């Protein structure tokens, strides 16, 4: 009897965790217009400068990955998006990563190391000073990773993941969703 109850308890906890992850809402939602915000470019063409990539990319198809930590899973996602951007140059696709941090100077070397190690060519790694992120973007404090895709100044896709919830299957779905901003 104890074994049955233990199995039932574990199953209910797993179901509840999956439900919470599925319902995590973070960032701008489809239909919203992404407002400008400034980041410090660490690995992109404006390395060392503060700029607004949202403004620079204008109405182009854009993937913006907000992360509070660059875990191996996040790095894998960035590398895959880097490839998609490279394959869609004729459509002027763009992407950038915004690391949300309270210590931007401390994270610069790590970002440069990741970009070099992974051979990132199309996705600038940037830092935003403040773990909460740009206020107008409504990044949930429960979200470790928030991915937004927009084109023509309208968000088309949003994915959000709590700490440890971004998996390979999610990365595959995010990459597949880039078609929503490329058509």
Describe each region flagged by the PLM.
Residues 22-51, 72:
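N-terminal "domain-start" segment that seeds a small globular fold
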Residues 1-12:
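Bacterial N-terminal signal peptides that target proteins for export
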Residues 91-106, 120-132:
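Thiol-based oxidoreductase modules, predominantly thioredoxin-like and allied folds used
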Residues 76-96:
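Conserved helix-turn-beta segment immediately C-terminal to the redox Cys motif
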Residues 57, 129-171:
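Thiol/disulfide oxidoreductase modules built on the thioredoxin-like
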Residues 50-75, 93-98:
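Short active-site neighborhood of thiol/selenol oxidoreductases, capturing the structured segment around
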Residues 12-21:
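Sec/Tat signal peptide C-region and signal peptidase I cleavage site
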Residues 38, 114-139:
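Short, internal strand/loop/helix patches
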């Amino acid at each position: 009897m104890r074994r049955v109850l233990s199995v039932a308890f574990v199953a209910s906890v797993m179901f509840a965790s999956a439900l919470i992850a599925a319902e995590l809402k973070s960032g701008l939602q489809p239909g919203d217009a992404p407002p400008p915000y400034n980041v410090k470019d660490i690995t992109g063409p404006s390395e060392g400068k503060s700029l607004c990539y949202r403004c620079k990319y204008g109405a182009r198809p854009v993937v913006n990955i907000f992360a509070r930590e660059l875990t191996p899973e996040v790095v894998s996602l960035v590398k895959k998006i880097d490839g998609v951007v490279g394959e869609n140059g004729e459509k002027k696709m763009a992407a950038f990563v915004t690391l949300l941090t309270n210590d931007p100077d401390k994270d610069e070397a790590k970002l440069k190391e990741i970009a070099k190690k992974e051979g990132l060519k199309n996705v600038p790694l940037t830092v935003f000073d403040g773990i909460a992120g740009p206020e107008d973007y409504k990044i949930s404090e429960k979200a470790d990773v928030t991915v937004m895709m927009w084109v023509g100044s309208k968000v088309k896709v949003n994915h959000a993941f709590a700490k440890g919830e971004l998996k390979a299957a999610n990365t595959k779905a995010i990459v597949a969703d880039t078609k929503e901003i490329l058509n």
